[in-house]
UniProtKB/Swiss-Prot annotation:
Key words of the record: Apoptosis, Cytoplasm, Phosphoprotein
Function of the protein: Plays a role in apoptosis.
Modification type Phosphoserine: residues: S44
Lineage: Eukaryota, Metazoa, Chordata, Craniata, Vertebrata
Annotated stretches, region: Disordered: 100-147
InterPro entries in the cross-refs: Bcl-2-like_sf (IPR036834), Bcl2-like (IPR002475)
UniProt-recorded name of the protein: Apoptosis facilitator Bcl-2-like protein 14
Gene3D superfamilies noted in UniProt: Blc2-like
Source organism: Bos taurus
BH2, short sequence motif: residues: 307-314
Length: 326
């Protein structure tokens, strides 16, 4: 079932302290410049990040040429972020953290994504159209009226470098040569009053599992898949809460294999991926963007900020050059 009680939809109040926090500002800038703006120019369908790192051994992670072909268009906006040229060397997330890696050429054919959810016994509810363009416009106005903090810009851009260095999927072909998408979400219809709670929990688990899988795609592909699957979009909006956002992010990060890496490198990479996951969830929410950003700020503060401060701050754990944050 896709219904939720009022307590499920209760929002976490966004205090001034939260909206002025470094975590919130990083998420806010990342959403605007690395999820919504110029996404199609950065990530083409040929290079979708559709799997967790655990599906390939650490020593065999390929280096994708798609992420080393020059400066990203989004880095040339009117704000103070610096253009980042990646043509000098190929890099994976490991080399971004200073780990030597043998370069490999990776070629893949454009995968055809078939992730339309199969529906069985679901009442035809009137789908609610996503309202993120309006929220994005609101954020545009906000950022236009205040200069972006150079420190926030540098950290968000560094996070994007790390996230985009995540290797693309190996080619997986069916007999017809198409791409096999993992997991098909099947929504269950009403099962009677006695099993209502169980059905609701199962339905929520299915929604979370499907969202986790879709978050492995680029922001552009995620948006396309959700536009095709109105039931998934509506059901996610109905169950959205901090606990759901936390569960989705936790499950996504558990699928990332960082075996053989130091704690600092592993946690740094997961922190970057957490920011990317939370930013992409703003695409799905039907409420003002601040709602998901509030959830994301709380998640980062609870799960990463204390550890980051203990290890010298964002700049140090992300291995940022000193000149980027002067």
């Amino acid at each position: 079932m896709c219904t939720a009680s009022p307590c499920d939809l209760e929002e976490i109040p966004l205090d001034d302290e939260d909206s002025d926090s470094l975590e919130f500002k990083i998420l806010e800038f990342y959403v605007k410049h690395h999820v919504f703006q110029n996404t199609s120019a950065i990530l083409s369908p040929k290079h979708l990040r559709t799997r967790s790192l655990s599906q390939k051994g650490p020593e065999r992670w390929p280096v994708s040429e798609a992420w080393t072909q020059g400066p990203w268009p989004c880095r040339h906006s009117q704000s103070s972020e610096k253009a980042i040229n990646l043509t000098k060397k190929k890099s994976s997330w490991r080399t971004l953290f200073g780990v030597a890696e043998k370069e490999e050429d990776s070629q893949s054919s454009p995968p055809e994504i078939c992730a339309q959810a199969q529906r069985s016994g679901v009442p035809q509810a009137r789908p609610r159209s996503p309202k993120w363009p309006r929220s994005r416009s609101s954020m545009d106005q906000r950022l236009e009226h205040k200069a972006a903090d150079p420190r926030v810009v540098s950290i968000a851009n560094r996070v994007a470098e790390i996230v985009y260095s995540w290797p693309p999927p190996e080619e997986v072909h069916s007999q017809g040569g198409g791409f096999k998408s993992k997991g098909v979400l099947v929504f269950q219809g009403p099962q009677g009053q006695s099993g209502a709670e169980s059905t609701k929990k199962e339905g929520e688990d299915q929604i979370i599992a499907r969202i986790v899988e879709l978050l492995k795609y680029s922001g552009e592909q995620l948006e396309r898949e959700l536009k095709k699957d109105k039931v998934l979009m509506t059901c996610f909006q109905d169950v959205l809460s901090y606990s759901v956002v936390k569960t989705i992010t936790d499950q996504f990060l558990r699928g990332v294999d960082t075996r053989g890496e130091s704690e600092v490198k592993a946690q740094s990479f997961k922190a970057a991926l957490a920011i990317d996951v939370i930013a992409k969830l703003t695409t799905i929410d039907n409420h003002p963007m601040n709602r998901v950003l509030g959830f994301g700020t709380k998640y980062l503060k609870e799960n990463f900020s204390p550890w980051i401060q203990q290890h010298g701050g964002w700049e140090k754990i992300l291995r940022m050059p000193h000149e980027e944050v002067d």
